[in-house]
Amino acid sequence: MTSDNLLALKGITKQYKEFRLGPLDLSVPRGYVMGLVGANGAGKTTAIKIALGAVLPGNGSVHLIDKTRVGVVLDRPCWQPGWQVRDLSRLLGPFYSGWNQRVFDELCEWAGVSQRLKVREFSRGMGMKVQVAVALAHGAELLVLDEPTSGLDPLARGELLDKLSEFMTDERHSVLFSTHITTDLDRMADLVTILDAGRVIASGVRDDLLEAWAMVRGGAADLTGELRARIRGLRQHSAGWEGLIAAADLGLCGAGVVADTPSVEDLLVHLAKGRKDA
């Protein structure tokens, strides 16, 4: 994997009254999509604010490429509610030497917004798409997106993910994508970092992480004491049990145990539950 990181967080911590983030190490190499996943309140937005310089960390260091090469898509646009779409190019364009008006106009058509539409009139999907339009119009190399698909209908969500996939056809580009909708990561992410209550519980190449674990299920007679001790996030029900186990421990499973490849959601749910049960 390339050492050409467009963003790198090292040893990041942030202490609030009732919440602590970190220590967090996270890198987004050129040409890769990093998915930052966790439940609401896990610390994803705090991590992104620290990455962008909007919040200072308690400890640690942040490396970020020049901010003129970074495109940001937040939960809600941070522009004045009374601005019209056409005002965005007039007011924001001069800050970027690479601003491309033609690209902006084409992307506004893709977003389905009139140049006269005001920011306060945006639907959630429009707000996300117009932020993407601004980011791509100024030639961003790194897109940082905070929960971009949350609350979108399936059509708008698919259109946004298609545009991000198109963006990633250029090997110079990278994406940091925070979400609690793990199916988005199944489609897009090369790398995954999973947060739970401010702590990293798994991080690495997505496919490697999925291969390192297995979802197992079986009947009550199959759950030996040794196997129980190795299972993360054990769930027991009337039909038997299920949980997550390291692939290296599959030899502990008897013939009645069924093993499957986990999803990112399985890792999030069962590793987080395993921490709480410990």
Show the residue positions of the predicted features.
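Catalytic Walker B motif of ABC-type/P-loop ATPase nucleotide-binding domains
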Residues: 143-147, 152
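The feature captures the beta-strand-to-loop junction immediately N-terminal to the Walker
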Residues: 37-39
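Conserved beta-strand
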Residues: 9-12, 19-29, 60
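ABC-family P-loop ATPase nucleotide-binding domains
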Residues: 74-131
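Conserved ABC transporter NBD signature motif
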Residues: 52-53, 57-69
